Amino acid sequence: MSNHNTNSGFTHEKIETSNFLMIVLILLVVAFGGIVEIVPLFFQKSTTEPIRGLQPYTPVQLAGRDIYVREGCYNCHSQMIRPFRAETLRYGHYSVAGEFVYDHPFQWGSKRTGPDLARVGGRYSDEWHRIHLINPRDVVPESLMPTYPWLEKAMVDPEEMAPHMRALRRVGVPYTDAQIAGAADEVKGKTELDALIAYLQILGTNLK
């Protein structure tokens, strides 16, 4: 009579019953998959070069982007238009990698409680955005968006901009010394509402 409980060699059961072996194999598979999927992207120009006309954010726009992140806008709004007809008809040209090369980190988001904002730049006036951010129900009665009245009085901190821009330059954003030196003066006197509107108004304007 054969002994069915005797296992030899590299078996499925041995993998499942050994935590260490399972972890090692998972790490190997993930590492290999990452090399195969991610590394080639660094050598494709379409994913590493900016689209024509793309410029780094101005200091005011950059401050607005920081406010967008701070207030968690990415939790309810995406910035990624998929190449589906329903989305391109509603929002415009589908998103491409070259639009986001200066975004660290990118703001693609993962859900749409509110609409996608990838092409919102220039779609509404500054005044519309001002009213909408202070009280969304004044322009969209059925809106679920929270109010942000404090942005109208909170001022952008000029001292934060130069260090932020220098940090971005280290990761490849082509800010010049002159742009960094003039950043504080450019945002001086700007409210957080001004900055956030400036950021929203630039989104998607390089590719329609």
Task: State the predicted function of each range.
Residues 68, 132-137, 198-203:
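Bilobed periplasmic-binding protein/Venus flytrap-like ligand-binding cleft at the lobe interface
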Residues 1-57, 171-176, 197-208:
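Post-cleavage N-terminal segment of exported redox proteins
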